[in-house]
Amino acid sequence: MSKKITDVVNIATSAAEIERYPTPEDRLVKGNPEQNNTLHFSTDDRFFVGEWGAEVGCWKVSYTENEYFHVLSGKSILRDTEGNELIVVAGDKICVPAGFEGEWEVIEPTQKIYAIYEN
């Protein structure tokens, strides 16, 4: 079936609602950061586009999905299980492969736009 212009999503003007939630206790490393997510687009349970943000803190991550993200603001550290770090700041464009495990540490409140493909 052919899609129409009404199926196109402009993220800047999307009416999607912001979901705010605490970081799950079993993943916390330090702090108690609130996270937020706005899902702008998903046609199935495999591909998602949205905006995400978090306050200062650190938690464990385990990616089952491939993710591309563009940092809009803030500063965070993505750390693998061996302690290797990648500092991400506004303007960075990052791809994280499914299977990545480690920690996400927010140094300054961070906001990103993302596209996720769940394997």
Where are each of the predicted segments found?
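Short acidic-glycine-tyrosine-enriched beta hairpin
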Residues: 82-98
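Short hydrophobic/aromatic-rich beta-strand segments that constitute the beta-sheet cores
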Residues: 61, 78, 112-114
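Short, surface-exposed charged micro-motifs
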Residues: 39, 68, 103
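Ligand-binding loop in jelly-roll beta-barrel domains
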Residues: 98-119
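A short, N-terminal "cap"/entry segment at the start of jelly-roll beta-barrel domains
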Residues: 1-46
